[in-house]
Amino acid sequence: MRDPLVNFPGYALRRAANATAAELASRLGAIGLRQSEVSVLMLIAANPGVTASALGRQLGIERANMVPLLKRLEGLIDRAPIDGKSQGLALTAPGETRLSAARAVVEAFEAELIARVPPEHRAHLLPALEALWR
């Protein structure tokens, strides 16, 4: 079938995003984690003491969706009061262990993903994608 949609960058991006997200979700599911959970764990590891609201802003996740996401990570994250209202988040020892396993999955997946891109386009891929969402 002819597909005139392939001439639209937005369509191509959506197809690529759907295909790669499904593949990564399957791999992370094998270790009992979701992409959003791994993203949160990675950001907390890089920013100990970060608040849930700051995580939500960074990831584009509404507050109503952050609450259950953080609930699923109980035991992997710890909360510590920052002031009267805010709590900072940090990884627990089990959280660091799970993140290490997740990072191995993500890094292997990302290496395979970039290997699919022709060598002459690899250096331009991330800057081009970033230009679309920054």
Regions found by a protein language model. Give the residues of each.
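N-terminal leader segment of winged-helix/HTH proteins
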Residues: 1-31, 88, 93, 97, ...
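Short helix-to-turn junction characteristic of helix-turn-helix DNA-binding domains
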Residues: 13, 44-48
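Charged, amphipathic alpha-helical coiled-coil/dimerization segments
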Residues: 21, 49, 71-130
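Short alpha-helical "packing" element that flanks the helix-turn-helix/winged-helix DNA-binding module
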Residues: 40-41
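Helix-turn-helix DNA-binding elements, focusing on the entry/boundary residues of the two helices
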Residues: 52
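Alpha-helical residues within the helix-turn-helix
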Residues: 57
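Helix-turn-helix DNA-binding motif, specifically the short coil turn and the N-cap/start of the second
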Residues: 62-65
